[in-house]
Amino acid sequence: MIISVMSKDRPGIIADVTGAIYELNGDLADLNQTVLCGYLTMILIATFDSSVTPEDVIAKLSHTKSDIKFDAIVKRMDTPIEILKAQVPEKTYILTAHGKNKKGLVFGISSFCYQRGINILDLTTTLADNKYTMILQLDLSHITSIKNVREDLAAFAKEAGLAVVLQHNDIFRVTNEVTMK
């Protein structure tokens, strides 16, 4: 199942959510969590016995003992996790873009991608000191010419006032990955 949670941030939300999954004998596969302007959002993938329904998960989550409640959505996944994990696109690229903050930057870059059939797999943005930074993980599987994308991206970046770097995911990982030994 895929589980999405949002709440005003407080200590213990992750323990509450993962505890509810554990109490239902669920196995947590993946989790992505962030706090943005005082609100926590989390998306999780967990497997359960076939008798556990999305409604069971919602019921368990709703019985969390806290003054600050959270909103949750639970859906069954169409494809088993093992199959999804094996399907990482070979032509995955990382696009970093930064420039002076102004309205429409995310709309502009997401429209650029959409118009070319580029799927955004992951997007993170940060605003600090009036500078806006975007990091996008892109699936370029349907692109026949990376050179054309780079040329179009350079023109877009110039018009938008952004500095951009597009590199293959493997190169990005090698140069930016932190390993734990």
Regions found by a protein language model. Give the residues of each.
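A conserved regulatory-domain signal marking ACT and ACT-like small-molecule sensing domains
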Residues: 1-181
